[in-house]
């Protein structure tokens, strides 16, 4: 229990500090098609640490009758103090036609440790159920405006089609940190 939580915290910190990178690839505009055709797009990325591949990220944007479904799976094999742990993060987001968040599910699995959260945008709040092990608890967060999932920022930016020098502001929700 405690070791898995510590490994999760360490993995997320490594990503946030930039010690684990997603590698260099084509410019964002080359990864996704023009704003008129975001449907059915897929992106694979390697996750590198000190130049060594430690995992992959797979993101898929699928069209739905009333918006999109954004699926992302991240798999990493981390070696922490000589102990190798597999870490799998899986998220699905159901997005509105403007790519803002409507509802989502998220799971994190590492060994026997499991964490999950599902939620929906409802009346200016993000209403969630958080599950750790066999325990589930509710969480209600007030919203200042529409939310975007991290993996949905690139398609939303392309959809916005900004001109050079124009700023775009996106309120991002990360289910892994509930922030």
Locate predicted features.
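N-terminal Sec-pathway targeting helices
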Residues: 1-8
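Solvent-exposed helix/loop surface patches that form functional interfaces
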Residues: 8-44, 109-179
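N-terminal mature ectodomain segment of secretory-pathway/periplasmic proteins
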Residues: 49-132
């Amino acid at each position: 229990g405690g070791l898995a939580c510590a490994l999760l915290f360490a993995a997320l910190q490594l990503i946030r500090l930039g010690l684990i990178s997603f590698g260099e690839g084509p410019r964002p505009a080359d990864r996704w098609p023009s704003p008129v055709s975001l449907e059915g797009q897929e992106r694979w990325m390697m996750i590198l640490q000190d130049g060594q591949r430690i995992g992959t990220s797979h993101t898929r944007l699928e069209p739905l009758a009333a918006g999109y479904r954004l699926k992302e799976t991240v798999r990493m094999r981390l070696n922490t103090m000589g102990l190798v742990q597999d870490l799998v993060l899986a998220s699905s987001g159901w997005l509105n036609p403007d790519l803002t968040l409507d509802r989502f599910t998220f799971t994190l699995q590492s060994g026997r440790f499991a964490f999950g959260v599902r939620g929906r945008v409802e009346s200016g709040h993000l209403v969630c159920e958080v599950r750790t092990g066999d325990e589930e608890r509710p969480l209600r967060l007030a919203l200042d405006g529409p939310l975007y999932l991290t993996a949905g920022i690139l398609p939303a930016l392309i959809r916005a089609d900004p001109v050079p020098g124009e700023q775009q502001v996106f309120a991002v929700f990360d289910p892994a940190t509930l922030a």
